Amino acid sequence: GLIVLNEMGLDPGIDHMSAMRILDRIRANGGTMEAFESYCGGLVAPESDDNLWGYKFSWNPRNVILAGAGSSAKYIDGGITKYIPYHKLFQRTVQVSVPGFDAFDGYANRDSLKYRSHYGIDGIPTLKRGTLRKGGFSIAWDTFVQLGCTDDSFIMELGADATWSDYLNAFLPPS
């Protein structure tokens, strides 16, 4: 026989397969769900964490930069639907502890509610999917968002000899 598999990256992909496996096990053991929160992220192995961001591009760099842009994050918390617009996304983070590691920044990942029926948890009062990044990432990234550095609605014409300083200065107000 021939097995055909499509690309099964992290998000969406492995995160959903892991979620379904856990939910199926809970149901098989007679359990019920009162809340569902799931975080994932392309985290750097400690021995390879050699930059201040604690991040390495493991997928399309443009998509990394635009992650979260385009629509508000949406989830439900205690029966109340929450919305986070992109310009606030990296300001509304939670700390997620993982044993053996420093705390991670967790932020809401797009529309969590569309997974309620897929996961079979339509009546659940809390459902949130999120992304993990190294602690401090969100504060730094939010600076770029607030400056407008992640806006792809225009083309910058700085020239081939432009420096990173020239790039950032282009977003700052006149002095």
Q: What is each stretch, according to the model?
A:
Residues 1-44:
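A contiguous active-site-proximal alpha/beta segment in oxidoreductase catalytic domains
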Residues 29-175:
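C-terminal catalytic/substrate-binding lobe primarily of soluble NAD(P)-dependent oxidoreductases
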